[in-house]
Amino acid sequence: MQVILLDDVKALGKKGEVVNVSDGYARNFILPKKLGLEATPKNLNDLKLQKAAEAKLAQEILEQAQALAKEIESKSILLKIKSGEGGRTFGSVSTKEIAIALKEQLGHDIDKKKLVLNDPIKNMGTYTVPVKLHPKVTAELKVKVDSL
């Protein structure tokens, strides 16, 4: 019997896959536990429509991320912090400060976890900070650190 899986089933398949199982396994385990549906033409058509809608939504999210990446890369943000002699800062600039400045100056509320900063910024100057907007889209944000 062919079954459309509604949930991941160990050693059988992932959600949305159509798999062949024995009639008894389908009737006694998969169907009663609502782990799958019988693969009727109507259910297969519903699955096809659902996958098409999910693909369209994923494409829209990707396009939004690409548009945001273009906007972020075309602009830069300025951070003013206290500094001592030789351009050394008191403290450091972390992803939290960059995310706050990004929201205030450009109006984009981006989570600090999406900003990739290997080490905190401790000197004055201009830096490029990668921003992971989507698994397939990374933008380069220009951050200028200046003294007060």
Swiss-Prot record:
Biological process annotations from GO:
translation
- One Pfam short name: Ribosomal_L9_N
Keyword annotations for this protein, in alphabetical order, are: Ribonucleoprotein, Ribosomal protein, RNA-binding, rRNA-binding
GO MF annotation list: rRNA binding; structural constituent of ribosome
A GO-annotated cellular component: ribonucleoprotein complex
The keyword rRNA-binding is assigned to this record: yes
Name the InterPro entries for this protein.
Answer: Ribosomal_bL9, Ribosomal_bL9/RNase_H1_N, Ribosomal_bL9_bac/chp, Ribosomal_bL9_C, Ribosomal_bL9_C_sf, Ribosomal_bL9_N, Ribosomal_bL9_N_sf
Task: Please tell me whether the keyword Repeat is annotated for this protein.
Answer: no
Family statement drawn from the similarity comment of this UniProt entry: Belongs to the bacterial ribosomal protein bL9 family.
Question: What is the role of the protein in this entry?
Answer: Binds to the 23S rRNA.
Q: What is this protein called?
A: Large ribosomal subunit protein bL9
